[in-house]
Amino acid sequence: MTAFHSVAVIGAGAWGTALAMVAARAGRSVTLWARNAEHATRIASTRDNPRLPGVRLAPDIVVTSELALAARADMLLIATPAQHLRGAVNMLASHIARPTPVVACAKGIEHGTHKFMTEVIAEAALHAQPAILSGPSFADDVARGLPTAVTLAAKEEELASSLVQALGSPTFRPYHSTDVRGVEIGGAAKNVLAIAAGIVVGRNLGASALAALTTRGFSELARLGRACGARPETLSGLSGLGDLLLSCSTAQSRNFALGIALGRGEAAPAGKLAEGAFTAPVLVELAAARNVDMPVSQAVAAILDNKLTIDAAIEGLLTRPFKAEE
């Protein structure tokens, strides 16, 4: 089994900072890369990131804006938003001269290409060994060392297991998998479904409706996963059902918070990127290409595109023909 002694986290937002703390707790030599030199200097000197207030960065984490320095690490965690993943890996590609694990830590599908995160990595960097980290996790919880469990998947089981050994600790428990596509579908779909759950809360439709929406949403996620060859245990595991339950239950989820705002007729929360808003139309197109029925996801995409009002979407879902549960 390969041992990874050094880890670089690309992206010094809240999630990137939390992952740097994870790697440091696991005993790795950690570099946190920030695109903005001033931002990097501030974090390095104060050991505080304004994007993750109240969390003090471990003293041995190196913070830099020099990409070449970060790229020397044994493994790379890409903590940029999904739609910026290709740009980040493109920048890294010329610095990666040997097989190096490149782990996507964002949940989504690339616009335009309809590529999943590991596919983007494989295209953008010749020597990258693509992997995906996903599951029920909030940056604040992870950074503070609260117990968290996630899934880390790569095509080769030995690589996935080695990555888990490199990042795991008593408070951060990754489970390894080779079902890369199943993990990616769970993370992408749950973001869209969390927006729908937030709309239910914003519209004050009640706890029963929220439970029904979450359950039927999982049915959509599972149908798409099966159509794409995902394993049932992945879809019902941490990166599928687990992440869906978390994202549909608290406004800490940016997608859930966006849904609440939409349901109340308010503006979207300022400065909060909700990946589900970008993923919704791509997810619906992916489902259509595989002849998978995803009415909740379709409703979210239509609402976000101003093609359907929330009231019309709710009525449409509630008046669908009765059928057997699946």
UniProtKB/Swiss-Prot annotation:
NADPH binds at residues 15, 35, 107, 139, 254, 273, 275. GO terms for molecular function: glycerol-3-phosphate dehydrogenase [NAD(P)+] activity; NAD binding. PROSITE patterns: NAD_G3PDH. Sn-glycerol 3-phosphate binds at residues 107, 135, 137, 190, 243, 253-255. Keywords: Cytoplasm, Lipid biosynthesis, Lipid metabolism, NAD, NADP, Nucleotide-binding, Oxidoreductase, Phospholipid biosynthesis, Phospholipid metabolism. It is an enzyme of class 1 (oxidoreductase). It catalyses: sn-glycerol 3-phosphate + NAD(+) = dihydroxyacetone phosphate + NADH + H(+); sn-glycerol 3-phosphate + NADP(+) = dihydroxyacetone phosphate + NADPH + H(+). The active site is at 190 (proton acceptor). Its EC number is 1.1.1.94. Its main location: cytoplasm. It comes from the Bacteria. Pathway: Membrane lipid metabolism; glycerophospholipid metabolism. It is found in: Cytoplasm. Pfam families: NAD_Gly3P_dh_C (PF07479), NAD_Gly3P_dh_N (PF01210). Catalyzes the reduction of the glycolytic intermediate dihydroxyacetone phosphate (DHAP) to sn-glycerol 3-phosphate (G3P), the key precursor for phospholipid synthesis. PANTHER family: GLYCEROL-3-PHOSPHATE DEHYDROGENASE, GLYCEROL-3-PHOSPHATE DEHYDROGENASE [NAD(+)] 2, CHLOROPLASTIC. This is Glycerol-3-phosphate dehydrogenase [NAD(P)+].
